[in-house]
Amino acid sequence: MKRFWKDVAVAQADGGWAIELDGRPVRTPARAALLLPNRALAEAVAAEWTSVGAEIDPRKMPLTGLANAAIDCVAPEREAFAAGLARYAEADLACYRSDWPPELVERQGACWDPLLAWARRRYDVDFATTSALSHVPQPPATVQCLSHAVAALDPFRLAGLSPLVTIGGSLVAALAVLEEAVPPEDAWAAVSIDERWQLEQWGADDDAEQALQNRKRDFLAAARFLKLLS
Protein backbone atom coordinates (compact mmCIF):
# COMPACT_ATOMS: atom_id res chain seq x y z
CA MET A 1 0.00 0.00 0.00
CA LYS A 2 1.23 3.46 -0.87
CA ARG A 3 1.49 6.27 1.65
CA PHE A 4 -1.68 8.37 1.39
CA TRP A 5 -1.17 10.96 4.16
CA LYS A 6 0.97 14.00 4.77
CA ASP A 7 0.59 14.84 8.45
CA VAL A 8 0.71 12.60 11.52
CA ALA A 9 -0.53 13.74 14.92
CA VAL A 10 -1.22 12.35 18.38
CA ALA A 11 -4.56 13.29 19.94
CA GLN A 12 -6.11 12.49 23.29
CA ALA A 13 -9.37 10.60 22.93
CA ASP A 14 -11.89 8.76 25.07
CA GLY A 15 -10.11 5.64 26.29
CA GLY A 16 -6.56 6.60 25.36
CA TRP A 17 -4.41 8.32 22.77
CA ALA A 18 -5.17 8.21 19.06
CA ILE A 19 -2.98 8.52 15.98
CA GLU A 20 -4.38 10.81 13.31
CA LEU A 21 -3.37 10.89 9.65
CA ASP A 22 -4.37 14.21 8.13
CA GLY A 23 -6.85 14.57 10.97
CA ARG A 24 -8.43 11.14 10.58
CA PRO A 25 -7.92 8.50 13.31
CA VAL A 26 -6.02 5.33 12.47
CA ARG A 27 -7.89 2.05 12.85
CA THR A 28 -6.64 -1.48 13.38
CA PRO A 29 -6.94 -4.17 10.69
CA ALA A 30 -10.19 -5.26 12.40
CA ARG A 31 -11.45 -1.65 12.10
CA ALA A 32 -11.27 -0.92 15.83
CA ALA A 33 -9.98 2.44 16.98
CA LEU A 34 -6.21 2.36 17.45
CA LEU A 35 -6.09 3.77 20.97
CA LEU A 36 -2.84 3.65 22.91
CA PRO A 37 -2.80 3.59 26.73
CA ASN A 38 -0.30 6.42 27.20
CA ARG A 39 1.22 9.32 25.32
CA ALA A 40 4.74 7.87 25.24
CA LEU A 41 3.63 4.81 23.27
CA ALA A 42 1.34 6.92 21.09
CA GLU A 43 4.19 9.22 20.11
CA ALA A 44 6.43 6.26 19.32
CA VAL A 45 3.73 4.71 17.14
CA ALA A 46 3.15 8.07 15.46
CA ALA A 47 6.87 8.26 14.70
CA GLU A 48 6.59 4.98 12.78
CA TRP A 49 3.80 6.43 10.64
CA THR A 50 5.79 9.61 10.10
CA SER A 51 8.83 7.66 8.91
CA VAL A 52 6.90 5.68 6.27
CA GLY A 53 8.28 6.25 2.79
CA ALA A 54 6.39 5.92 -0.47
CA GLU A 55 5.25 2.39 0.44
CA ILE A 56 4.00 1.04 3.79
CA ASP A 57 6.28 -1.71 5.12
CA PRO A 58 4.76 -3.36 8.22
CA ARG A 59 8.16 -4.83 9.13
CA LYS A 60 9.34 -1.30 9.85
CA MET A 61 6.34 -0.59 12.10
CA PRO A 62 6.67 -3.16 14.91
CA LEU A 63 5.09 -0.98 17.60
CA THR A 64 2.03 -0.42 15.44
CA GLY A 65 1.82 -4.15 14.81
CA LEU A 66 1.97 -4.97 18.52
CA ALA A 67 -0.65 -2.35 19.33
CA ASN A 68 -2.93 -3.78 16.64
CA ALA A 69 -2.40 -7.26 18.08
CA ALA A 70 -3.23 -6.07 21.60
CA ILE A 71 -6.55 -4.64 20.44
CA ASP A 72 -7.64 -7.11 17.75
CA CYS A 73 -6.18 -10.41 18.97
CA VAL A 74 -5.36 -10.29 22.68
CA ALA A 75 -8.13 -8.21 24.22
CA PRO A 76 -11.03 -10.38 22.94
CA GLU A 77 -9.36 -13.56 24.27
CA ARG A 78 -7.15 -12.24 27.05
CA GLU A 79 -7.44 -15.21 29.42
CA ALA A 80 -6.79 -17.80 26.71
CA PHE A 81 -3.91 -15.77 25.29
CA ALA A 82 -2.31 -15.46 28.73
CA ALA A 83 -2.73 -19.18 29.35
CA GLY A 84 -0.91 -19.95 26.11
CA LEU A 85 2.09 -17.87 27.14
CA ALA A 86 2.03 -19.28 30.67
CA ARG A 87 2.51 -22.80 29.32
CA TYR A 88 6.12 -21.89 28.60
CA ALA A 89 6.68 -22.10 32.37
CA GLU A 90 6.46 -25.88 31.99
CA ALA A 91 9.49 -26.06 29.68
CA ASP A 92 11.53 -22.87 30.00
CA LEU A 93 14.64 -22.69 27.84
CA ALA A 94 16.79 -21.77 30.85
CA CYS A 95 16.06 -25.15 32.44
CA TYR A 96 17.48 -27.22 29.56
CA ARG A 97 21.27 -27.34 29.52
CA SER A 98 23.99 -28.90 27.43
CA ASP A 99 26.47 -31.23 29.09
CA TRP A 100 29.15 -30.77 26.41
CA PRO A 101 31.33 -29.01 25.39
CA PRO A 102 32.49 -27.31 28.59
CA GLU A 103 32.62 -23.84 27.01
CA LEU A 104 28.96 -23.99 26.00
CA VAL A 105 27.99 -25.35 29.42
CA GLU A 106 29.80 -22.40 31.01
CA ARG A 107 28.17 -19.86 28.70
CA GLN A 108 24.71 -21.23 29.37
CA GLY A 109 25.27 -21.14 33.11
CA ALA A 110 26.59 -17.58 32.98
CA CYS A 111 23.49 -16.41 31.10
CA TRP A 112 20.74 -18.58 32.51
CA ASP A 113 21.66 -19.03 36.17
CA PRO A 114 21.17 -15.31 36.98
CA LEU A 115 17.74 -15.36 35.29
CA LEU A 116 16.58 -18.34 37.33
CA ALA A 117 18.04 -16.79 40.49
CA TRP A 118 16.08 -13.61 39.82
CA ALA A 119 12.85 -15.56 39.32
CA ARG A 120 13.43 -17.52 42.52
CA ARG A 121 13.76 -14.28 44.47
CA ARG A 122 10.98 -12.44 42.68
CA TYR A 123 8.33 -15.16 42.77
CA ASP A 124 9.56 -17.42 45.60
CA VAL A 125 9.69 -20.45 43.31
CA ASP A 126 12.19 -23.14 42.37
CA PHE A 127 13.16 -24.77 39.10
CA ALA A 128 14.22 -28.21 37.96
CA THR A 129 17.03 -28.16 35.39
CA THR A 130 18.35 -30.97 33.24
CA SER A 131 20.93 -31.82 30.60
CA ALA A 132 18.84 -34.74 29.32
CA LEU A 133 16.87 -34.58 26.10
CA SER A 134 13.62 -35.54 27.79
CA HIS A 135 11.13 -33.17 29.40
CA VAL A 136 11.67 -32.37 33.08
CA PRO A 137 8.52 -31.42 35.01
CA GLN A 138 8.61 -28.17 36.92
CA PRO A 139 7.20 -27.92 40.46
CA PRO A 140 3.45 -27.28 40.23
CA ALA A 141 3.79 -24.27 42.54
CA THR A 142 6.30 -22.73 40.11
CA VAL A 143 4.03 -23.19 37.11
CA GLN A 144 1.07 -21.83 39.04
CA CYS A 145 2.90 -18.76 40.31
CA LEU A 146 4.32 -17.80 36.91
CA SER A 147 0.93 -18.44 35.32
CA HIS A 148 -0.69 -16.05 37.78
CA ALA A 149 1.93 -13.41 36.95
CA VAL A 150 1.09 -13.64 33.26
CA ALA A 151 -2.67 -13.79 33.83
CA ALA A 152 -2.53 -10.48 35.70
CA LEU A 153 -1.24 -8.57 32.67
CA ASP A 154 -3.37 -6.30 30.50
CA PRO A 155 -3.75 -6.91 26.74
CA PHE A 156 -1.01 -4.46 25.75
CA ARG A 157 1.56 -6.01 28.07
CA LEU A 158 0.54 -9.48 26.95
CA ALA A 159 1.00 -8.44 23.32
CA GLY A 160 4.48 -7.13 24.11
CA LEU A 161 5.39 -10.15 26.20
CA SER A 162 4.35 -12.62 23.51
CA PRO A 163 7.28 -12.15 21.08
CA LEU A 164 9.75 -12.25 23.97
CA VAL A 165 8.37 -15.61 25.06
CA THR A 166 7.82 -17.21 21.68
CA ILE A 167 11.03 -15.99 20.05
CA GLY A 168 13.22 -16.75 23.05
CA GLY A 169 11.47 -19.79 24.47
CA SER A 170 11.92 -18.47 28.00
CA LEU A 171 9.06 -17.10 30.07
CA VAL A 172 11.54 -16.27 32.83
CA ALA A 173 13.66 -14.10 30.52
CA ALA A 174 10.54 -12.40 29.16
CA LEU A 175 9.24 -11.56 32.63
CA ALA A 176 12.68 -10.26 33.60
CA VAL A 177 12.57 -7.86 30.63
CA LEU A 178 9.00 -6.84 31.47
CA GLU A 179 10.00 -5.98 35.03
CA GLU A 180 13.23 -4.31 33.88
CA ALA A 181 15.31 -6.75 35.91
CA VAL A 182 17.60 -7.39 32.94
CA PRO A 183 18.49 -5.23 29.91
CA PRO A 184 16.81 -6.45 26.71
CA GLU A 185 20.17 -6.95 24.98
CA ASP A 186 21.30 -9.24 27.82
CA ALA A 187 18.05 -11.18 27.65
CA TRP A 188 18.50 -11.61 23.90
CA ALA A 189 22.06 -12.83 24.43
CA ALA A 190 20.73 -15.41 26.88
CA VAL A 191 17.91 -16.80 24.74
CA SER A 192 19.99 -16.89 21.54
CA ILE A 193 23.09 -18.48 23.03
CA ASP A 194 22.62 -21.89 21.41
CA GLU A 195 22.08 -20.48 17.93
CA ARG A 196 25.03 -18.15 18.21
CA TRP A 197 27.17 -21.06 19.40
CA GLN A 198 26.20 -23.09 16.34
CA LEU A 199 27.12 -20.21 14.05
CA GLU A 200 30.49 -19.91 15.77
CA GLN A 201 31.21 -23.61 15.39
CA TRP A 202 30.01 -24.18 11.86
CA GLY A 203 30.52 -20.79 10.30
CA ALA A 204 28.05 -18.11 9.35
CA ASP A 205 25.31 -19.08 6.94
CA ASP A 206 23.74 -16.04 5.30
CA ASP A 207 20.18 -17.28 5.68
CA ALA A 208 20.67 -18.41 9.27
CA GLU A 209 22.41 -15.18 10.20
CA GLN A 210 19.64 -13.09 8.65
CA ALA A 211 16.98 -15.14 10.41
CA LEU A 212 18.75 -14.60 13.73
CA GLN A 213 18.99 -10.86 13.12
CA ASN A 214 15.30 -10.70 12.23
CA ARG A 215 14.40 -12.46 15.46
CA LYS A 216 16.64 -10.11 17.42
CA ARG A 217 14.96 -7.11 15.79
CA ASP A 218 11.51 -8.39 16.74
CA PHE A 219 12.64 -9.32 20.26
CA LEU A 220 14.10 -5.88 20.95
CA ALA A 221 11.09 -4.13 19.41
CA ALA A 222 8.80 -6.01 21.80
CA ALA A 223 11.05 -5.04 24.70
CA ARG A 224 10.82 -1.40 23.63
CA PHE A 225 7.03 -1.69 23.41
CA LEU A 226 6.92 -2.91 27.03
CA LYS A 227 9.28 -0.17 28.15
CA LEU A 228 7.01 2.47 26.63
CA LEU A 229 4.11 1.05 28.62
CA SER A 230 5.89 1.46 31.95
Q: For each predicted feature, which ranges?
A:
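An N-terminal structural lobe/cap that precedes and organizes the functional/catalytic core
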Residues: 1-76
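Conserved active-site and cofactor/substrate-binding residues in soluble primary-metabolism enzymes
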Residues: 37-40, 76, 110, 166-167, ...
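Structural signal for hydrophobic packing residues in well-ordered secondary-structure cores
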Residues: 49, 53, 119, 123, ...
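Short coil/turn segments at secondary-structure boundaries
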Residues: 58-61, 131, 203
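Internal, conserved structured core segments that host functional sites
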Residues: 79-145
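An internal, amphipathic alpha-helical element
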Residues: 137-206, 220
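Long, charge-rich low-complexity segments
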Residues: 209-230
